[in-house]
Amino acid sequence: MLKISLSDGTIVDIENSVLSIFQSYEQRQLWAKEAGGILIGKQVENEDHYVLSAVTTPTKHDKRTRFSFTRSILSAQPFINKKWQESNGTENYLGEWHTHPEANPIPSDTDKALIRQIVSDKSSPFPKVLLVIV
């Protein structure tokens, strides 16, 4: 498990199975397309601490190019519902992830707009929303 401490004091634990998925989609070749999906996890009760336990991977419905990824909503909600039920309501949608074709990825303006949208429409039940760029 990877433990990350963010500058605002938030702690994020990423399970090894999720790290393996992220690594498998890194854009190492010039022809590799961006990939992404949703983040599923839970908040440690009464703490600014999150555990990232599952992610979706690209589907045939997603739009992938070398420099962009647009996730389809078709498969996301059923996956969220399944994880919520399996966890007795503790795990839910925590945010989004995708790759960038650069060694040190930084959020684009599109990425920042996506996070603002998720926060404003309250897509996530948690106080914080995560964006992981691989």
Give names to the regions the model predicted:
Residues 98-100:
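Histidine-centered divalent metal-coordination motifs
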